[in-house]
Amino acid sequence: MSVSSFCNLTGKKVLVTGSSSGIGKAIAIELAQAGADVLIHYRKSKEAAEMVASQLQKLGRKSETLSADLACLENYESLLNQAFQTWGQLDIWVNNAGVDLLTGSEAKLDYGQKLEKLLDVDVRGTVLLSRAVGERMQQQGRGCILNIGWDQSDRGMEGASGELFSTSKNAIMGFSRSLEVSLAPQVRVNCIAPGWILTAWGENASDVWQERVKRETPMQCWGTPEDIAKMARFLCSDEAAYITGQVINVNGGAVR
């Protein structure tokens, strides 16, 4: 498959956490289409992860799968070591893995349990993995880290889910800005803040939520995982070489 010269990532070695489905999968595919070799991380969806890796291999890219439960602190070093051993280097690390409080098994947990899960996986995972991979990238003399936030975090959203996600995603967005200062100039760090993106929850959302998305979004439609992936491709490329420490909304111009 030919690769466009714009945002060309040929030869880049990448790991995307939580990339067996949804936004993570879309990012992995987009970066592979840009020429990158991509490691697919998953927690328990082995078959889905292997299907993504196979899809990337059909594009002519190298791709393997790595499993790690990011709720367990002891798995972090192992995941990082496996990634560097597989590629010999890592040019791009995307922290996409997160707890699904809306459609997954965690949806049945109480408020405190949900908060604990988010802090363990979304926040601690992003912070500690970013710092560890960032240190190695500094030693390489180059690298790019991309995190995933949420556009409503800094504006606020009603309800338990709004409170919980705002807590975790605001932490990630603030951390991204500070980590950039620590790792520059060798390593760039940015964060994408998605708006209403049509993933598993959105596909089954009620008519009330469907109308709310249209009402709050000037584009009057859901965004797609591919919309996030295209921004990820740009931010990971040399075309974004002077962009770091930024939290960029991809939300159809949503206002609330």
Located regions from the model:
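Conserved mid-core segment of classical short-chain dehydrogenase/reductases
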Residues: E77, D100-E116, E158-L164, E203-D207
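Amphipathic alpha-helical dimer-interface segment in Rossmann-like NAD(P)H-dependent oxidoreductases
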Residues: V121-Q139, S153, E180-P185, S237
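Short, small/polar-rich loop/turn modules that mediate ligand/substrate recognition or access, typified
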Residues: A184-R188, I243-G245
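Catalytic loop of short-chain dehydrogenase/reductase
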Residues: V99-D100, L146-A171, S176-A184, W196-I197
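Short C-terminal tail/terminal secondary-structure segment
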Residues: S2-N8, D100, G104, E211, ...
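Conserved glycine-rich cofactor-binding loop
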Residues: S20-S21
